[in-house]
Amino acid sequence: MSGKIKVTFIVNDGEEKTVEAPIGLSILEITHSNDLDLEGACEGSLACATCHVILEEEFYNKLKKPTEAEEDMLDLAFGLTDTSRLGCQIILTEELDGIKVRLPSATRNIKL
């Protein structure tokens, strides 16, 4: 697990922030280590949808399909799109170099 890739985050005002991120970490971990606003209330345990992100189709298609548990949580996400994923479930790999990740302007945290 060595090496870094470029990840560009698009925040709700359209501003882009590009960071170098270590391969093997999740999008959720990268947002937290770079002071970007992505909640992750359940800390990556697939119990909420507050780390919902939107990907470009090119990169969405490079990921493994979401698990049933992730799809169940995505159903609760605010502003769901065809290329929505949970940031805690996207683990960075070399083929994701240059990925663009849109951070939604709002989240929905439903306590179960």
From Swiss-Prot:
Family: Belongs to the adrenodoxin/putidaredoxin family.
GO MF annotation list: 2 iron, 2 sulfur cluster binding; electron transfer activity; metal ion binding
Protein name as it appears in the record: 2Fe-2S ferredoxin
Function: Ferredoxin are iron-sulfur proteins that transfer electrons in a wide variety of metabolic reactions.
A biological process term (GO) from this entry: P450-containing electron transport chain
InterPro entries: 2Fe-2S_ferredoxin-like_sf (IPR036010), 2Fe-2S_ferredoxin-type (IPR001041), Adrenodoxin-like (IPR001055), Adrenodoxin_Fe-S_BS (IPR018298), Beta-grasp_dom_sf (IPR012675)
Residues covered by the 2Fe-2S ferredoxin-type domain: 5-107
Gene: fdxB
Cofactor or coenzyme needed: [2Fe-2S] cluster
Binding site for [2Fe-2S] cluster: C42, C48, C51, C88
Cofactor note (record): Binds 1 [2Fe-2S] cluster.
Keywords: 2Fe-2S, Electron transport, Iron, Iron-sulfur, Metal-binding, Transport
CDD domains according to UniProt: fer2
